[in-house]
């Protein structure tokens, strides 16, 4: 059916070019909201009516006439009908829809994937300060970022996952001071406890390991504590390494890996920040005022010019960001996606302005951004605000411990990134169709159970399903399920292009719903072996697509529940 869809799309494009050679609209099919309206819908006649100054129903008939002359339409389509003001409803032949089952079974885990290309993308996400455990906002970033990486990989891209460590800011000094205070026997609330210190129990854990002169490994680096409470620089280095290690453990528990870790401090150590500022000054894109160095960001659409270097000689926080993205470009990544919290919205214009002003060939609009809003955690009907481990927020590890990795990943991807999300812990633990991840995973487990029953009760061999007589699949619920399977590749490519992994979650819920309706309507272990085999082939194809889609989200597909 994938081949049929491709050929029909070409036929539609040719027919539109015939009707409107000077301004043909983009050829596209839509999915009717009701099955009674056909399998695919075409709205092109209504789009063309105004520019061509013709009645949309007359145009629809002309388009149908043009389509019916195409060989692909004759091969794959049963009927074309005009509806309403100018819709065209397209009904596929049963044999067309049945092909999707064989296509899925033949492709397996590759169904929906495109051939490998030379395209390269770098996706930066999480990028937490190494000052504490990962919170639920970092969890949303991790789920979104990893799913976007997997989406691009399904489209044949080579993807690099990068974590940027902000290890050169004021907060690192606060971390060191907090740990030193613990080493001095102080605790939150005591006289002498730093006003801006981190209060979580993890600070006491860092202090204890520092006194014990332990060695921690973070990424590819090791650091051994000196055990000296007066060694503030040693405390700083150990605390950063300790928390980087802890964050790595959190990400491992979440099933997220990174290919590369980039340190903000390296931008200063290698002179990249100074070099970037030098390029901007040499290009005449800066000016001095009030003892500070300013960047002319208004030349690139920003609402006002921005300070780059303050009068005390320190850089504002967007300057290393500009240097970092110049580095990404120089590494050959011309497709870069940043996953960040919505509080970073104000930095986008100035970073892009700095990249344009640097005049190194970076195009406008580089990099792409996906900004996500906050996550609120509810448990027992009340908002959870504080974690003992973190001291002031709910951690990602808390959620994983409470509900499991699969629930956390699916839930955090189940809404558009730019909407606030309420994570209901109680809902995530429910074992019914109210819980979206359970609903989808249960569909897969249910299919596996039916196939096991077939093997045990009727000595069925799953290897024979690829040879099933698919002509037996004519029930309305079967047609609905096959059409939903056929929509998977198009959905994947659209989700990748739009940076919208929530589309995958929406699709999987719809697919699970189509399966559950089918399960309720039909029997699968019948007295007719050919019918049973055909239906089980459809179930096996459905299970495969469920597995493929869940894998994109980093969620498992259990055989039993």
From Swiss-Prot:
GO biological process: arginyl-tRNA aminoacylation
Chief place of localization: cytoplasm
Taxonomic superkingdom: Bacteria
Location of this chain's protein in the cell: Cytoplasm
Catalytic activity as recorded in UniProt: tRNA(Arg) + L-arginine + ATP = L-arginyl-tRNA(Arg) + AMP + diphosphate
Subunit relationships: Monomer.
Keywords assigned by UniProt, alphabetized: Aminoacyl-tRNA synthetase, ATP-binding, Cytoplasm, Ligase, Nucleotide-binding, Protein biosynthesis
NCBIfam families to which the protein is assigned, alphabetical: argS
Protein name as annotated: Arginine--tRNA ligase
Pfam families referenced in this protein's UniProt entry, alphabetically: Arg_tRNA_synt_N (PF03485), DALR_1 (PF05746), tRNA-synt_1d (PF00750)
EC class: ligase
GO CC annotation terms, alphabetical: cytoplasm
Motif 'HIGH' region location, chain numbering: 128-138
Single GO molecular function: arginine-tRNA ligase activity
Family: Belongs to the class-I aminoacyl-tRNA synthetase family.
């Amino acid at each position: 059916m994938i081949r049929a869809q491709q050929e029909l799309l070409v036929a539609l494009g040719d027919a539109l070019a015939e009707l409107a050679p000077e301004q043909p609209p983009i050829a596209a099919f839509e999915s009717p909201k009701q099955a009674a309206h056909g399998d695919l819908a075409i709205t092109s006649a209504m789009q063309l009516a105004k520019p061509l100054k013709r009645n949309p129903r007359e145009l629809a008939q002309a388009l149908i006439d043009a389509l019916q002359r195409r060989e692909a339409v004759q091969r794959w389509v049963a009927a074309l009908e005009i509806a309403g003001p100018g819709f065209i409803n397209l009904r596929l032949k049963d044999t067309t829809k049945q092909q999707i089952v064989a296509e899925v079974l033949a492709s397996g885990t590759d169904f929906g994937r495109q051939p490998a290309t030379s395209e390269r993308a770098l996706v930066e996400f999480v990028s937490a300060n190494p000052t504490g455990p990962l919170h639920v906002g970092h969890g949303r970033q991790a789920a979104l970022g990893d799913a976007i990486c997997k989406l691009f990989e399904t489209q044949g891209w080579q993807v690099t996952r990068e974590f940027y460590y902000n290890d050169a800011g004021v907060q690192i000094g606060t971390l060191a001071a907090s740990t030193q205070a613990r080493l001095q026997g102080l605790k939150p609330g005591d006289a002498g406890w730093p006003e801006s210190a981190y209060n979580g129990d993890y600070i006491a854990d860092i202090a204890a390991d520092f006194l014990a002169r332990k060695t921690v490994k973070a990424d590819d680096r090791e650091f051994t504590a000196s055990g000296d409470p007066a060694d503030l620089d040693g405390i700083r280095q150990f605390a950063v390494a300790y928390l980087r290690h802890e964050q790595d453990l959190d990400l491992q528990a979440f099933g997220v890996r990174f290919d590369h870790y980039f340190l903000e401090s390296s931008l200063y150590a290698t002179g990249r920040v100074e070099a970037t500022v030098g390029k901007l000054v040499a290009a005449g894109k800066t000016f001095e005022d009030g003892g500070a160095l300013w960047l002319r960001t208004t030349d690139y659409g920003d609402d006002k010019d921005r300070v780059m270097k303050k009068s005390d000689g320190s850089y504002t926080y967007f300057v290393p960001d500009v240097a970092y993205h110049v580095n990404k470009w120089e590494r050959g990544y011309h497709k870069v996606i940043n996953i960040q919290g919505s509080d970073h919205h104000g930095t986008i214009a100035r970073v892009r302005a700095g990249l344009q002003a640097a005049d190194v060939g970076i195009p406008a609009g580089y990099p792409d951004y996906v900004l996500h809003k906050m996550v609120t955690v509810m448990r027992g009907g009340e908002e959870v605000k504080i974690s003992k481990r973190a001291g002031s927020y709910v951690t990602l590890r808390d959620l994983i411990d409470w509900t499991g990795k699969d629930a956390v990943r699916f839930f955090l991807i189940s809404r558009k990134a730019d909407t606030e999300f309420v994570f209901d812990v109680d809902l995530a633990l429910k074992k019914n169709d109210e819980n979206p991840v359970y609903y989808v995973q249960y569909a897969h487990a249910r299919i596996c159970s039916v196939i096991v029953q077939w093997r045990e009760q009727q000595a069925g061999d799953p290897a024979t399903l690829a040879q099933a007589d698919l002509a037996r699949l004519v029930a309305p619920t079967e047609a609905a399920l096959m059409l939903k399977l056929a929509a998977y590749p198009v959905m994947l490519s659209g989700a990748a292009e739009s940076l919208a992994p929530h589309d995958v979650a929406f699709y999987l819920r719809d697919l699970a719903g189509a399966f559950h309706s089918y399960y309720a309507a039909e029997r699968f272990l019948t007295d007719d072996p050919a019918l049973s085999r055909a239906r089980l082939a459809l179930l096996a194809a459905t299970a495969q697509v469920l597995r493929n889609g869940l894998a994109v989200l980093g969620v498992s597909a259990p055989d039993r529940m």
